[in-house]
């Protein structure tokens, strides 16, 4: 392991011990805000500190085994070789674990997220596919014990959605879902296709972290254009007799959000404002990330929702992730929400990229 990384780890252990001491300080115990902040820092440092102490112990075990390998007794030397082998394997495993623990954490990873799905090229079939994607994500959320709340939906005439916006709440939702942003393509024979030809349709998916109230950007009332209209269902029929639906336009950025799922105009406005704030913050973060990572591959995408990330091929039962050249033949399981076999390899590739950046920096 590089000396610079060892120094960083030793500094973290020192801070861990300092925080441990502070948590027993009467002044800290009497200040709930400070106690909470230090408790959170303590829990964040605990795993990396424990792992580093195991690494140091493994190094000591290796040194002791190497000394034993110089003994005159042949049986002792043989035993020492086994211990050297075990210690080296342990050191290698712990080194990998420590490097992953040192990767800078995305502060958004623990947050809830907004999921946007929009039908793209392909007409009615794209709308049906948008419905398939929403069902897939809903099933996945159910398996994870998360809660899905529809914020806004625009139903397609033939089923599915022209647009669907949902909020997903639970543990580490954004960190799990963030790599889903991008273009999703489907290849299948539509039910209306009499010749049995395979058609290609597409949807775009955007995943944005929910912004805590304290971190919300200041949005001036003068920068907003708010329109009210009657909520409509499929085919344009009005499903509400009052103008409860809301359309908010953020004039400086041109961002538009509609919400019509609640009967109350007030609730629709609150939902639309939450999505608008998330979109504005996400757009700013994407611009900043693009400026920083022009020369580095970014699995989170360029911010261009048309970036094709995945293809779902029904005739072959195949799902392909184009970012990491991954293909699996488990389409039915994936559509039923069994997505971990798709998500884990992308996360691992992302961590490998971050480790490469960490190595360059150190």
UniProtKB/Swiss-Prot annotation:
Q: Which GO terms describe its cellular component?
A: cytoplasm
The name this protein goes by in its record: Peptide chain release factor 1
In this chain, where does the modification N5-methylglutamine occur? 237
Record keywords: Cytoplasm, Methylation, Protein biosynthesis
What is the primary gene name for this protein? prfA
Q: Which family does it belong to?
A: Belongs to the prokaryotic/mitochondrial release factor family.
Q: Which residues form a coiled coil?
A: none
Q: Where in the cell is it found?
A: Cytoplasm
A single GO molecular-function term is: translation release factor activity, codon specific
Q: Which InterPro entries match?
A: PCRF, Pep_chain_release_fac_I, Pep_chain_release_fac_I_sf, Prokaryotic/Mito_RF, RF-1
Q: Which Pfam families match?
A: PCRF, RF-1
């Amino acid at each position: 392991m590089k000396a610079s990384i060892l120094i960083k780890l030793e500094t973290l252990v020192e801070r861990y011990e300092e925080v441990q001491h502070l948590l027993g300080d009467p002044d800290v115990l009497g200040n709930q805000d400070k106690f909470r902040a230090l408790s959170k820092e303590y829990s964040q440092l605990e795993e990396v500190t424990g792992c580093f102490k195991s690494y140091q112990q493994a190094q000591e075990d290796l040194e002791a085994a190497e000394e034993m390998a110089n003994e005159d007794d042949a049986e002792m030397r043989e035993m020492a070789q086994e211990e050297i082998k075990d210690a080296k394997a342990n050191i290698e495993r712990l080194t990998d674990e420590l490097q992953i623990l040192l990767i800078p954490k995305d502060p958004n990873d623990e947050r809830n997220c907004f999921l946007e799905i929009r039908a793209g090229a392909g007409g009615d079939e794209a709308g049906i596919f948008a419905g398939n994607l929403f069902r897939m994500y809903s099933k996945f959320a159910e398996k994870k014990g998360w809660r899905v709340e529809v914020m806004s939906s625009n139903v397609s005439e033939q089923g599915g959605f022209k647009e669907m916006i949902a909020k997903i709440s639970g543990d580490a939702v954004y960190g799990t879902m963030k790599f889903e942003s991008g273009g999703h393509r489907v290849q299948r024979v539509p039910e209306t296709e009499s010749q049995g030809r395979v058609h290609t349709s597409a949807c775009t998916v955007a995943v944005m972290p929910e912004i805590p109230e304290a971190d919300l950007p200041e949005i001036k009332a003068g920068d907003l254009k708010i329109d009210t209209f009657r909520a409509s269902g499929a085919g344009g029929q009005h499903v509400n007799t009052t103008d409860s639906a809301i359309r908010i336009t953020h004039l400086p950025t041109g961002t538009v959000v509609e919400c019509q799922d609640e009967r109350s105009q007030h609730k629709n406005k609150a939902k639309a404002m939450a999505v608008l704030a998330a979109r504005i913050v996400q757009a700013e973060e994407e611009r900043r990330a693009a400026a920083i990572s022009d020369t580095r591959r970014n699995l989170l995408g360029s911010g261009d929702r048309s970036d094709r990330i995945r293809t779902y091929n029904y005739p072959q039962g195949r799902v392909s992730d184009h970012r990491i050249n991954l293909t699996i033949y488990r389409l039915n399981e994936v559509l039923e929400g069994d997505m971990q076999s798709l998500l884990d390899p992308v996360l691992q590739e992302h961590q490998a990229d971050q480790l490469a950046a960490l190595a360059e920096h150190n």
